Amino acid sequence: MAASENGKKMADKKLYKVVFLNNNKVYELFSNNVVSSGLWGFVEVSGLVFETSDGLVVDPTEEKMRQEFEHASVLHLPIQSVLRVEEVAKRGQCLIRDRKSGEKVTPFPVSPPSRSSS
C-alpha cells in the first residue's frame, strides 16, 4: 500500500467524543465508532481510543477508564444517558466530571494518614 493511500485510510477513520452519564458522573471518552445499537433504546460505542504513550506521566482519570472498560469490546449505552456525540478531528483528554458540580473528578490512590500512638 502506498504511503498516500495509508495516510488517506488514517484520515478516513472517524473519531468521536462521546459524553455520557455513568454512576452520577459525566464521562467523556473517545471512540472510532458510534451507531444505533441492535438493542432497542441503546447507542453502541466501540473502538475506544486511549492515550498510548509509554512515558512516566500517567493520567489517573484515563487509566481508571482504561481499566474500567478493558474487557468491553462494545459499550451499549442507554440512549437517555448519552449527553452528546461529537465528530472531532483529534483526540482530547478523557475526563470524568461530577454530575452536579461539573468539576473534574481525579481518582488518586490515597492511603489514609497513619495513626501514631501518643
What are these regions (language model features)?
Residues 1-118:
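Eukaryotic intrinsically disordered, low-complexity regulatory linkers and tails enriched in Ser/Thr/Pro
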